[in-house]
């Protein structure tokens, strides 16, 4: 983590916790080694949602639907969320989680490669949350910027890769070098 531990502790101290369904989905994801957003990002998203009150949210990278459900829980009730996922094994899990959370009408999951799906979208979004293959973000950016409403908010999770991105190429562990190069 590149954020000072005291800052992380402070951010976490402000968080009021999650709903039962979010706690359950988080626990199941972590037990299955499915990456989901960290507590700090959860708190940050809740703050952004409270401040900006978006009506339309785009998420790139659904996984098991944790972030989508979190945003649906804390965004205005009339907010619509569109989320994109390419990994076939996670799509049915995400859909089931949306139903469990009672958010299946608020969240639309689009299946496919984000680079292709983004090109098919036309309506602007108030908030775009990117949490997919970090090395692909540069390829998504023209469509992301086209879809982001003027004055909208773009959030990209983990773009600093725990600080690796600011390190020398040689200081980055071998398994992280491909992501490092692409970013």
Regions found by a protein language model. Name each.
Residues 1-129, 134-155, 159-183:
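A short alpha-helical cap/connector motif
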């Amino acid at each position: 983590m590149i954020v000072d531990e005291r800052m992380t502790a402070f951010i976490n101290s402000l968080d009021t916790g999650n709903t039962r369904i979010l706690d359950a989905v988080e626990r199941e994801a972590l037990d299955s080694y499915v990456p989901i957003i960290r507590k700090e990002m959860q708190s940050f998203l809740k703050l952004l949602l409270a401040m900006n009150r978006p009506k339309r949210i785009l998420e790139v990278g659904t996984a098991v639907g944790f972030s989508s459900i979190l945003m649906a829980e804390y965004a205005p009730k009339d907010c619509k969320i569109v989320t994109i996922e390419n990994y076939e094994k996670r799509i049915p899990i995400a859909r089931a989680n949306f139903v469990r959370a009672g958010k299946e009408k608020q969240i639309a999951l689009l299946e496919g490669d984000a680079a292709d799906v983004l090109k098919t979208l036309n309506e602007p979004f108030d908030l775009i949350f990117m949490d997919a293959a970090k090395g692909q973000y540069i390829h998504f950016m023209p469509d992301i910027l086209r879809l982001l409403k003027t004055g909208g908010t773009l959030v990209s999770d983990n773009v600093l890769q725990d600080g690796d991105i600011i390190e020398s190429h040689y200081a980055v562990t071998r398994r992280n070098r491909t992501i490092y190069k692409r970013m």
